[in-house]
Swiss-Prot record:
GO terms for biological process: methylation; negative regulation of gene expression. InterPro entries: SET_dom, SET_dom_sf, SET_SmydA-8. It comes from Drosophila melanogaster. GO terms for cellular component: chromatin; nucleus. Keywords: Methyltransferase, S-adenosyl-L-methionine, Transferase. Belongs to the class V-like SAM-binding methyltransferase superfamily. The keyword Transferase applies. It is an enzyme of class 2 (transferase). This is SET domain-containing protein SmydA-8, isoform B. Its EC number is 2.1.1.-.
Amino acid sequence: MSTSTPVTEEPRSSSQMTISASTQELAELINIHLGDLRPEEPSWRVADSPISGRGIFATREIAAGEELFREHTLLVGPTAHRSMNLRTCTLCYRLIPGSTDSAALCPAGCGLPVCSECRDSTRHDLECKLFRKWKPLESQRIEPRALRILSVVRCFFLDEASRKLLYAMQANMDRYYMQEVQRAADCFEHFPREQDMLDYFYRTICAFNTNAFESRSNVDGHEVLVRALFPLAGLLNHQCTPNAAHHFENGETIVVCATERIPAGAEITMSYAKLLWSTLARKIFLGMTKHFICKCVRCQDPTENGTYLSALFCREQGCRGLVIPVQTRTLQPDWRCITCENVFPHAKMAKYQDFALNTINNRINSCSVQDMIHFINELCPRFCPSSNYVLIEAKLNVIWRMTRFDHEEYTPEEMGHMDRYREEVLAILHKLGAGECTLKKLITGEIQ
């Protein structure tokens, strides 16, 4: 797992497409979509939100750790990331046996990788016929662009109620989204040109990019990332320290639970960014991907509840104090040392943050667990405070590799370092008031 931070840019401009349903109509469509998963007496309701648009509100007091709802996806498909093995079935996400693309591709010529068990399914038959009608230009190689667009193409197979739900969801327009349509068209000889189909396709892309989640599917030890659209979960508005969190039972089912006690009438929220990112990193990410700048309580506290996730070392000679951003409503704040009180321009401190980020990222991508432990313990303290979010993510990387991904045995000393990293991360989550969040459950092994 590598750590990353967004590039410092102003948020792209976007506008919202017209929503075709009232809040009440949306709630009714959500109930239809949930089907058997809808509780007899839900602890929540859909209503207009003072944060943004529509939201989900508690109808009674909800206990910390209580499951709020689970939901199946409306649309889902592979991300086709560069790191992903493309010889993955587009339906069950199993790794397809063989070593060549051609062996994994559907023999009917649709251009989609599909396993022998799913090849004759009704679901694949629909997609296969549509892709063959469009005539894929690549017949012997798996085309990543076609895989990336598959989740959106599946909108053509939705029933009437699901289509209405899709049109009832928030859909932010962005000029870059049109490029996705063009990239999809470039994969086929006869991609549809009818305006109504293109409009529906573009609307789906906008709704998908506005609301979709990236989830993990693990089948027989083969893990892949998928992008999935969950209409109810997508209504949860953002707070940097939210009162709810989600995890996935598989790539196509989301489970949302309360992380703390939620009083009746309160809005239920989740975080769109990583909990342990610094305020500036979260603001840039949210501005670039969600087109808003968060102004929650955490974002207005330069110390972030005393966690100092943004902190860097002071650059004044002879001072080793912590420097933190002092303005919370700008993407280019001044930074002030809490020891000597010297003020530094954002451009200077951003360079030091980028140095720490790149140095740690390079190690994460190339080092063994043992080398990472030595790097974190012996070298990082020379240039990066132990509280800095980039170093925290490096410690998380070690935890994940030692507990989830690697199968080698470690020495008692190495296990001791991992346990210390775990306690440090849990202490930060406690300071943030993150409650029973998904990250805590993953670290403690409560969920896998």
